[in-house]
Amino acid sequence: MVPNYSTEETVKRIHVDCPVSGRHSYIYIMVPTVYSIIFIIGIFGNSLVVIVIYCYMKLKTVASIFLLNLALADLCFLITLPLWAAYTAMEYQWPFGNCLCKLASAGISFNLYASVFLLTCLSIDRYLAIVHPVKSRIRRTMFVARVTCIVIWLLAGVASLPVIIHRNIFFAENLNMTVCGFRYDNNNTTLRVGLGLSKNLLGFLIPFLIILTSYTLIWKTLKKAYQIQRNKTRNDDIFKMIVAIVFFFFFSWIPHQVFTFLDVLIQLHVITDCKITDIVDTAMPFTICIAYFNNCLNPFFYVFFGKNFKKYFLQLIKYIPPNVSTHPSLTTKMSSLSYRPPENIRLPTKKTAGSFDAE
């Protein structure tokens, strides 16, 4: 929808060129329902992740620090979902005021950048740990990981500033309702393009290429170990985890990124047909739902792929205190979205042809 701004008041009045764009009754039922499901499962799952990592795993590894911050970033976003569920259920009537409009919108943007930056750092950490296990030990320290997380939170905050500044509530005169959206000056094309393309490039394309490259190099290293290892079960598990990470990340975000780019074209008046605008505005909430499932399902990667995480998770469910462990010698190493693969992969010699352990 492309607004034309007419007056400047406490609540600015706008006129919408395509007033029926994206306004369908089934959206007002389906999308809030999906948001509610994501909220319940996401809050429960990510809260368990925080408890397990912080209380049971004790932040002993670099990966655990990144994973804890990833779960916290997801929680920061998830607490805003009830607002968006209500907003959609009320047919895009925003009743919560300008402050919550800005904060809830910034929460989405902040989570997008924080999550993708953390996943990128996790992929780089996995690459260094597996491909360069000895050389990387000096750089892969707990201190460096904590500083990196602080920098990521700051960068995500900076990237979300335009949302806080330019997202406001407006009164749509021909819709007779108050909406929460962006206000663009008619001649300000830089902001329109910048917000959309930054989400496309910084929030998806560049991180995805880094993640894909990192895990491709990891797989090549594991493939070499395949050729001289008798028992491939553990390597198969790692490979499945790698494929799941890349596949899930790409396919959960690509629909939203494509329609975000189309929305930029609409804002630039490259696309002016209201029928196409309606398709974009109708599809956008559903692409957002697909992307939001990333926040909801991340914890299940830990359970399915993380043997140590699964052990601690079961302890938590059974109310076993963190200091009680049936296998105290087990490590807490995890991977980027599951267990952490071995710190040092030993390429077996003839005497140790069946080993593939972590130090």
From Swiss-Prot:
Q: Which residues cross the membrane?
A: 26-55, 62-89, 99-125, 142-165, 191-216, 240-268, 279-304
Gene Ontology terms: cellular component: plasma membrane
Principal localization?
membrane
Residues bearing attached sugar chains per UniProt: 4, 176, 187-188
One Gene Ontology BP term is: positive regulation of blood vessel endothelial cell proliferation involved in sprouting angiogenesis
Show which residues sit on the Extracellular side of the membrane: 1-25, 90-98, 166-190, 269-278
What is the annotated localization of this protein?
A: Cell membrane
* Modification(s) after translation: C-terminal Ser or Thr residues may be phosphorylated.
Q: Which residues lie on this side of the membrane: Cytoplasmic?
A: 56-61, 126-141, 217-239, 305-359
Tell me which family the UniProt entry assigns to this protein: Belongs to the G-protein coupled receptor 1 family.
Q: What is this protein called?
A: Type-1 angiotensin II receptor
Name the species this protein comes from. Gallus gallus (Chicken)
Give me the gene this protein comes from.
Answer: AGTR1
